Amino acid sequence: MSAPSNVELDPGAVRGLVARAGDPKRERWLDQVRRTGACRHPVRLRGVVLRGDEPVYSTAGEPDGALMVRCGNRREACCPSCAHEYRGDMWQLVYAGMAGGRKGVPESVAEHPMVFASLTAPSFGAVHTRRDDGRACRCGTRHAPDDVDLGQALDPTSYDYECAVLWNWHAPALWNRFMVELVRVLAMRAGVSEREWRQRSRVAYAKVAEFQARGLVHFHAIIRLDGAQDRALAPGVTVSADELAAAIAEAAGRTSLVSEAGNGETVELRFGEQLHTRILAGDGGEVCAEQVAAYVAKYSCKASHEQITSRDSDPDRWCERGVPEQLVQMAAAAIGLSQRPGLRGLGGWVHMLGFRGHFVTKSRGYSTNLGTLRADRAAYRAQQDEPDETQDDSMPVLGFWQYLGSGYLNPGDALLAAGVEASLRAAREALLDARRVPL
């Protein structure tokens, strides 16, 4: 495996390439890189595995005396390889909850009332937008899809950046209130009490948060109704998919939250007026499960901006990397708010523009979970290795590990890993192309 040909090599990279080329354990090192999927920032570990009192594995014999494992970062901009694996797991998790018949989810859930809903943030000031009907923006321009002005405030002096950050900060709590309100609306529409509705039915969901160009999160969610005690059963209160969609819209409009602004004032936060619902199952589907799963999985690997990381919460440096001014202003507002009483925690979420929730969340009964998917993958990989039939399987296996560092030891190793990553990516794309060609 050689370094990518279009990269200008510095002396440090050349020295690293030469050293690895002469390394007698080079092939084992490349095998480790492949096993991590050519992770951009692999974690290097030193350790030993014992079966009883007898060592069965040690990193002493590995290249550089270390074992490399994935960094596990879900963000595409940080590690495309780990993001690809996370995206695949998320697709399986989301799809199983819609289609059923896999990952321990009963087939019957596919016939339950199910809606794909998008809940938006409200407006905190006019921004540059691109209209689907071809009309010009309020600034008089018809913006292209990749226009850098999209999402930027038309008048930064009047845009309410503080309220925008507070909305992101409280968005997870607003979602929780929406779920409570949805049950109330469903019970009211069915003519039963909330308690009776919960005894007969249950709401299951999976949602992903998506950052818009204006720096505010939207929620995209699959919302499904099940029986209260068993997700294999239909909800005990009869509800059509259309009725569920209407209840979602009503509940979103009724949901609100009052937030302290830290300066003695309060702000009422709500979802935006734009709300989209599409039927997935029940009385008739408007969009297929595969498309929705791919949509949710794609956004599960996004961040507030590809040039913003959790290690850098200084908006002054963001400008140098081309981060839009809208996001820089929101970060500055988050820093300012974090100095106020009751909002100190905001300082740890500047890189997320105040959003402190997980990008992907689900209810317990919706589907499988990431831990199970990862355990299944680890078991599958273990089965691919040659078993040692001389080992006593009744003896406990213990591992003792020490963290050595993250990333490759030198630029040359990083370049070689980039070449492996390119090869793996090309192989995946070729496989996808082959699947698209009809036989």
Predicted features and spans:
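Acidic/histidine-rich catalytic neighborhood
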Residues: 215-221, 255-282
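Long, low-complexity, charged/polar intrinsically disordered accessory regions
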Residues: 1-87, 271-439
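Long, contiguous juxta-domain segments that are non-catalytic but functionally important
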Residues: 63-114, 119-136
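A short, contiguous, amphipathic alpha-helix enriched in charged residues
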Residues: 168-200
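Histidine-centered divalent-metal-coordination microenvironment in nucleic-acid enzymes
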Residues: 79, 117, 196-230, 296
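Helical (often loop-to-helix) elements that flank the catalytic cores of nucleotide-handling enzymes
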Residues: 222-264
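A solvent-exposed, charged loop/short amphipathic helix patch at secondary-structure junctions
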Residues: 129-166
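Catalytic micro-motifs at enzyme active sites that drive phosphoryl/nucleotidyl and oxygen chemistry
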Residues: 64-68, 102-107, 191-213
